[in-house]
């Protein structure tokens, strides 16, 4: 979940991710679950190339700064507090997961089991995660709206073609007893 937030912190070329998207009439959001992180844009079809540019650029040159990491840690810790600690029975799901799953990664909430998991993350761990998961060969682009397959394919090649393919970490998921 923390990494989802960091993806909106800008890239080396585009320090404010939201600004060019909003100028193009678009908006964005994301969600994370145990299997995927889904980043999505809603943008007028005449500005679709702006979306490709933004997505490929942050996959290519995400800005790994300590300042952004520190800021987003605070945001995610506040989310953790609001969602799990400041609500009656809010932490019930945190207690339930390890009872349901003994070995499987589903035992871990995407936000972390407790605040210390968020606090302990450092910039090197963030970089390692990025370079072992965020690559064109580990991404799915889904488009709907007023765009043809040929146009989508051409734009994907244009904007993601130059992004280096990476050795993607494959999860070895243990079976439950």
Describe the function of each predicted region.
Residues 2-42, 108-111:
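M16/MPP (pitrilysin/insulinase) zinc-metallopeptidase core fold and M16-derived inactive scaffolds
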Residues 19-23, 63-81, 148, 167-177:
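Acidic/histidine-enriched alpha-helical segments
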């Amino acid at each position: 979940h923390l990494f989802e937030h960091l993806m909106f912190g800008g890239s080396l070329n585009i320090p404010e991710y939201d600004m060019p998207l909003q100028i193009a009439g678009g908006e964005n959001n994301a969600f994370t679950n145990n299997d995927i992180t889904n980043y999505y844009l809603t943008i007028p079809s005449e500005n679709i190339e702006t979306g490709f540019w933004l997505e490929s650029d942050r996959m290519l040159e995400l800005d790994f700064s300590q300042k952004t990491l520190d800021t987003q840690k605070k945001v995610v810790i506040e989310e953790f507090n609001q969602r799990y600690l400041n609500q009656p029975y809010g932490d019930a799901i945190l207690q339930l997961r390890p009872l349901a799953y003994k070995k499987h990664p589903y035992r871990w909430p995407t936000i972390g089991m407790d605040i210390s998991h968020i606090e302990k993350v450092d910039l090197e761990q963030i970089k390692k995660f990025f370079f072992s998961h965020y690559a064109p060969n580990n991404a799915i682009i889904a488009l709907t709206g007023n765009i043809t397959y040929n146009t989508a394919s051409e734009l994907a090649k244009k904007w993601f073609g130059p992004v280096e393919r990476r050795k993607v970490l494959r999860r070895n998921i243990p079976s439950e007893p």
